[in-house]
């Protein structure tokens, strides 16, 4: 492990925190320390995954809050604690040597109850956002294995609901995940395979566009346009979009907010060309 040679690396301390995490004596503090230091040690994921009892301890932390989800009684401190556990899972999901093991163990399924919550309180919002971060870490590297596995789960409907009802930050991570599915050929084919799947995605994107008319959330708009552009690569979806693409993307509604983003303007122009809206592009 190359980081053992780093002058800032404290292997004895890291292993002591792991012992505390597994033994349960000072688990909460161990979660805080490990999650705080996780970006300093690029091999921490390997230590976490291969250390006896660590994954069991992290899953215990996650499962322990299930009874607090419905009715929604999750408190801030409890949310912070489980989010520290989720941050360590994200560390494991991000590492190239542990990602596939993480996936094969179906750890992501333990996070879906968190994504399925509806409460808009800060503890729940933080829980959803951190859970999305774990999924985002998995899809970030465009791995076909990750896409294929997640397509067999309910992650897309969960992300769509968050895209419609979540905070701006949660919406941004959720649409990033959906965009990753769309950018994969298998993912695009899956979403466009039935009208119901396409309509579920398109209707949420349409609703987001109408919300963006008022909020002008730039990061979200970039993702929305890229999702539409990728959908237009599918012949059936392209034909449907000719009839249902929201008007604010056809006219100059977002011209001001996009004026300095040449890449996103090019994406929007290409989308309109794909849908044969040449007249609008040339205005």
From Swiss-Prot:
GO biological process, any: nuclear-transcribed mRNA poly(A) tail shortening
GO cellular component, one term: nucleus
Superkingdom of this protein's organism: Eukaryota
Pfam families assigned to the protein according to its UniProt record, in alphabetical order: Rcd1
Gene3D superfamilies (alphabetical): Leucine-rich Repeat Variant
InterPro entries in the cross-refs: ARM-like, ARM-type_fold, CNOT9
Keywords from the named record: Differentiation
GO molecular function: RNA binding
Function: A differentiation-controlling factor that is essential for the onset of sexual development. Induces ste11 when sexual development is invoked through nitrogen starvation.
Family: Belongs to the CNOT9 family.
Name assigned to this protein: Cell differentiation protein rcd1
């Amino acid at each position: 492990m190359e980081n053992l040679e780093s002058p800032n690396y404290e292997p004895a301390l890291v292993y002591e925190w792991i012992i505390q995490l597994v033994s349960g004596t000072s688990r909460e503090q161990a979660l805080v320390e490990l999650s705080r230091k996780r970006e300093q040690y690029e091999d921490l994921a390997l230590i976490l995954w291969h250390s006896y009892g660590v994954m069991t301890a992290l899953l215990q932390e996650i499962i322990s809050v299930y009874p607090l989800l419905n009715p929604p009684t999750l408190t801030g401190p409890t949310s912070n604690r489980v989010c520290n556990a989720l941050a360590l899972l994200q560390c494991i999901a991000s590492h190239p040597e542990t990602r596939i093991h993480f996936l094969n163990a179906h750890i992501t399924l333990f996070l879906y109850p968190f994504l399925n919550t509806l409460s808009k309180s800060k503890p729940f919002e933080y829980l959803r956002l951190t859970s999305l971060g774990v999924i985002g870490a998995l899809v970030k590297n465009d791995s076909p294995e990750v896409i294929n596995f997640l397509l067999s789960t309910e992650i897309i409907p969960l992300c769509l609901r968050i895209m419609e009802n979540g905070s701006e930050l949660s919406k941004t991570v959720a649409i990033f995940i959906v965009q990753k599915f769309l950018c994969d050929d298998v993912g695009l084919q899956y979403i466009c395979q039935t009208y119901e799947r396409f309509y579920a995605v398109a209707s949420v994107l349409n609703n987001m566009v109408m919300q963006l008319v008022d909020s002008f959330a730039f990061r979200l708009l970039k993702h929305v346009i890229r999702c539409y552009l990728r959908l237009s690569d599918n012949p059936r979806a392209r034909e449907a979009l000719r009839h249902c693409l929201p008007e604010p993307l056809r006219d100059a509604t977002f011209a001001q907010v996009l004026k300095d983003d040449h890449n996103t303007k090019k994406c929007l122009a290409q989308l309109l060309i794909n849908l044969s809206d040449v007249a609008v592009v040339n205005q």
